[in-house]
Amino acid sequence: MKIYLVGGAVRDQLLGYPHHEQDWVVVGATPQQMLDAGFKPVGKDFPVFLHPETQEEYALARQERKTAPGYTGFAFHADETVTLEQDLLRRDLTINAIAMDEEGTIIDPYNGKRDIETRTLRHVSQAFCEDPVRILRIARFAARYHHLGFRIAPETLALMRDMVQAGEVDHLVAERVWKELSRALEEQHPAIFIQTLRECGALHRLMPELNALFGIPQPEAHHPEVDTGVHALLALERACELSSTPEVRFAALIHDLGKGVTPKHLWPSHHGHEQDGVALVEQLCNRLSTPNQFRELAVAVCAYHTHCHRAFELNAKTLLKTLLALDGLRRPERFQQFCLCCQADAQGRTGLENRPYPQAAYFLQALEEIQKVDAKMFVAQGKKGAEIGEAMYSARLQKIKLLKTAQTPHE
């Protein structure tokens, strides 16, 4: 029996990159030997065990064989005759197909170290194209290691395109797509994830509402980048600088979906794209089984981002109505996230990344003012039922009017 550290831990150790989990492969052992050594079986489809002390995963070396379309259509073979090289051959990328023995010696049969040095994401073998999840994974690795200079090998990108054209991505279930997308949103450069999916054709299949934005023009006076899809990626990049919260990043990415359905004869204007986009955001989130906190923020940003941009132009009633519609009183944290998304949108434009966005602070200040209105003061005055609600509305409106009177004029 021989035990090797494999996968991400070895890769990131060679990169000098932080890693939090360690995976191990065991060569020359049987399931019974693992049980006799105190390991706990956890693998449903193939022999995987938890170490009795560290709780880290130890898998018996195995081979895979494609039996049906999709990422679940595999048969596995695992016994003591499977070699380390055979186990590493089934892995997705060469940089993930490196092992380290208990003495610290590197075993690298597929030149993963070379690809780490040249910053290349390259498939190990043609078996790469048998699992469509690998398209999402390589896009996520491209997003994670972009700042280190990693790029996808041309032949690997060509394989990804072939997989998309063969319909492999159509077999991905929504939960798996969302799992990879949500993880990508937490990487340093999630825009690279989206760009990679677009380059191989997968974005059209998985997120057609977003893919539709590329090539649609916006007024150059407001959007020097012109292309709506490019703007979506710039907004995402700015959101990443403003917040590490994946909900904020997701909402910034899809805030302009409504521009994808603007009739061509109206281009480059997109009047009403906010409400047009809400149904598309809902549609996308339904298809991906997106968690509620992502969906709710994305819908709010889509519907009201231009209200925030026009904050200083809104009259008191409209501003109050907007704050209430955004549920700012009950959900102040989400309201702050909304304001960050609006800032990311405004600054996610070529050459305007550092332009001040005082509208966000103004919106937050307006919310702070109406938070000062307490129902107790009206109850103490003897008001009841609907009278309390009316009095609170009037008091809040007065707070907004005073704020508007005191505000410094903005351009």
UniProtKB/Swiss-Prot annotation:
Subunit structure: Monomer. Can also form homodimers and oligomers.
Domain notes from UniProt: Comprises two domains: an N-terminal domain containing the nucleotidyltransferase activity and a C-terminal HD domain associated with both phosphodiesterase and phosphatase activities.
Family (UniProt): Belongs to the tRNA nucleotidyltransferase/poly(A) polymerase family. Bacterial CCA-adding enzyme type 1 subfamily.
Cofactor(s) the protein requires to work: Mg(2+); Ni(2+)
Top-level taxon: Bacteria
Pfam families from the UniProt entry: HD, PolyA_pol, PolyA_pol_RNAbd
Function according to Swiss-Prot or TrEMBL: Catalyzes the addition and repair of the essential 3'-terminal CCA sequence in tRNAs without using a nucleic acid template. Adds these three nucleotides in the order of C, C, and A to the tRNA nucleotide-73, using CTP and ATP as substrates and producing inorganic pyrophosphate. tRNA 3'-terminal CCA addition is required both for tRNA processing and repair. Also involved in tRNA surveillance by mediating tandem CCA addition to generate a CCACCA at the 3' terminus of unstable tRNAs. While stable tRNAs receive only 3'-terminal CCA, unstable tRNAs are marked with CCACCA and rapidly degraded.
Residues where ATP binds: G8, R11, R91, R137, R140
Catalysed conversion reaction: a tRNA precursor + 2 CTP + ATP = a tRNA with a 3' CCA end + 3 diphosphate; a tRNA with a 3' CCA end + 2 CTP + ATP = a tRNA with a 3' CCACCA end + 3 diphosphate
Matches recorded under HAMAP family: CCA_bact_type1, CCA_bact_type2
Disulfide cysteine pairs (residue numbers): none
CDD domains with a match to the protein in the record: HDc, NT_ClassII-CCAase
Limits of the HD domain: 228-329
Enzyme Commission (EC) number: 2.7.7.72, 3.1.3.-, 3.1.4.-
Additional note from the record: A single active site specifically recognizes both ATP and CTP and is responsible for their addition.
Keyword set, alphabetical order: ATP-binding, Hydrolase, Magnesium, Metal-binding, Multifunctional enzyme, Nickel, Nucleotide-binding, Nucleotidyltransferase, RNA repair, RNA-binding, Transferase, tRNA processing
Signal sequence, start to end: none
GO terms classed as biological process: RNA repair; tRNA 3'-terminal CCA addition
A GO molecular function held by the record: ATP binding
Cofactor note: Magnesium is required for nucleotidyltransferase activity. Nickel for phosphatase activity.
Residues the entry annotates as binding CTP: G8, R11, R91, R137, R140
Binding site for Mg(2+): E21, D23
Protein name (Swiss-Prot/TrEMBL): Multifunctional CCA protein
Record bears the keyword Ribosomal protein: no
NCBIfam families: PRK10885.1
InterPro entries in alphabetical order: CCA_bact, HD/PDEase_dom, HD_domain, NT_sf, PolA_pol_head_dom, PolyA_RNA-bd, tRNA_CCA-adding_enzyme
Lineage: Bacteria, Pseudomonadati, Pseudomonadota, Gammaproteobacteria, Cellvibrionales
